[in-house]
Amino acid sequence: METKQVFKLTNEALQTHNNFQWTVGEWCEAPGTGELCSKGWLHWYHSAELALLMNPIHANIDNPRLFVAEASGAMRDDFGLKGGSTKLRITQEIQYVAPTTEQRVKFAILCASAVCRDKSFIKWANGWLNGSDRSCGEAWAAYYAAADAAAAAAAA
């Protein structure tokens, strides 16, 4: 059976959504039906970093435990943000350092930069990322320019 190394977050009791119980080394199976964000799939992340960065908007687990896992069977992917498979087992708990505020902001800017084409936002984002401009005034100006552009696009 071919497997893929992935990463899984659990709570302190090795549980995930709806108190699904995990045991290190034991395979769990799902039918592979429905949308990725459903009980038909076992969810995981491509990297430890992505698991920790996405936790607040996905599982929102307080004090998560992070595991290396093996995924197998049918697989689905959500544009690289998370994945799911029909077979999954957690194999080894790993220690981690939680992302810093700066790392979270950088990640958010990179995500927004992938879709926002507003020139003032891009200028500000590049300045923030390269460290040349991290001023609040420029951040607010970029925010308002992007909001105005979004409102104009929605009205069109």
Residue ranges and their predicted role:
Residues 1-156:
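Short, glycine-biased loop/turn motifs at secondary-structure junctions and
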